[in-house]
């Protein structure tokens, strides 16, 4: 299957927010063949890299991240919004269009594995703020984020540039616009 079929499976919802084309992944994950292909692309990329954990960003990142962790036979680490993790956490604030928010990770998320190799997964990268905060969280508890992978990259919003100082970026489908 080519990447165009994956791109074609993503529904574009115009003006979901005024002036925004929302990339709806529910049509992708609802198509078993396409969903499997996305996970296979990611599995093939990471299966020979000695990755220790997959970390994923709430909520849509969990869909792809947990499936990938299962396919690789490694642990899955959720990165969640404030108040959603029940044990000791650390947080990282990030800027939104109209304010700030914060993400949390358990302080023991990587099971005391020194310098664990982690791949960060999310469904989409736009401006990169959420991903940047997530990479900082991963690093702050002693792991290394070897790459951040996204199903969709909205190139026009330049999120890759925000992540460049911290990690490499991989995406399956790219859209030039915003």
UniProtKB/Swiss-Prot annotation:
Enzyme class: transferase
Catalytic activity: AMP + diphosphate = 5-phospho-alpha-D-ribose 1-diphosphate + adenine
Location (main, coarse): cytoplasm
Pathway where it operates: Purine metabolism; AMP biosynthesis via salvage pathway; AMP from adenine: step 1/1
Cellular localisation: Cytoplasm
Pfam families assigned to the protein according to its UniProt record, in alphabetical order: Pribosyltran
InterPro entries listed in its UniProt record: Ade_phspho_trans (IPR005764), Adenine_PRTase (IPR050120), PRibTrfase_dom (IPR000836), PRTase-like (IPR029057)
Source organism, top-level taxon: Bacteria
Alphabetic keyword roster: Cytoplasm, Glycosyltransferase, Purine salvage, Transferase
Coiled coil: none
GO-annotated cellular components: cytoplasm
Enzyme Commission number(s) of this protein: 2.4.2.7
GO BP annotation list: adenine salvage; AMP salvage; purine ribonucleoside salvage
CDD domains on file: PRTases_typeI
A GO term, aspect molecular function: adenine phosphoribosyltransferase activity
Its job: Catalyzes a salvage reaction resulting in the formation of AMP, that is energically less costly than de novo synthesis.
Subunit structure: Homodimer.
Record family assignment: Belongs to the purine/pyrimidine phosphoribosyltransferase family.
Protein name as it appears in the record: Adenine phosphoribosyltransferase
Biological source species: Helicobacter hepaticus (strain ATCC 51449 / 3B1)
Lineage: Bacteria, Pseudomonadati, Campylobacterota, Epsilonproteobacteria, Campylobacterales
Gene, per the UniProt record: apt
């Amino acid at each position: 299957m080519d990447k165009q079929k994956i791109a074609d499976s993503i529904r574009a919802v115009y003006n979901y927010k005024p002036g925004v084309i929302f990339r709806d992944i529910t049509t992708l994950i609802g198509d078993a063949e396409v969903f499997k292909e996305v996970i296979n692309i990611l599995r093939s990329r990471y299966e020979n890299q000695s990755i220790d954990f997959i970390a994923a960003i709430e909520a849509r990142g969990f869909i792809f991240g947990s499936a990938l962790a299962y396919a690789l036979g490694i642990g899955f680490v959720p990165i969640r919004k404030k108040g959603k993790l029940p044990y000791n956490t650390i947080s990282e604030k990030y800027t939104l269009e109209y304010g700030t928010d914060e993400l949390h990770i358990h302080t023991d998320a990587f099971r005391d594995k020194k310098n664990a190799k982690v791949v960060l997964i999310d469904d989409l990268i736009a401006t990169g703020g959420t991903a940047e905060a997530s990479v900082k969280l991963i690093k702050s508890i002693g792991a290394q984020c070897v790459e951040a992978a996204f199903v969709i990259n909205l190139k026009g919003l330049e999120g890759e540039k925000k992540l460049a100082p911290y990690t490499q970026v991989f995406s399956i489908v790219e859209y030039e616009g915003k």
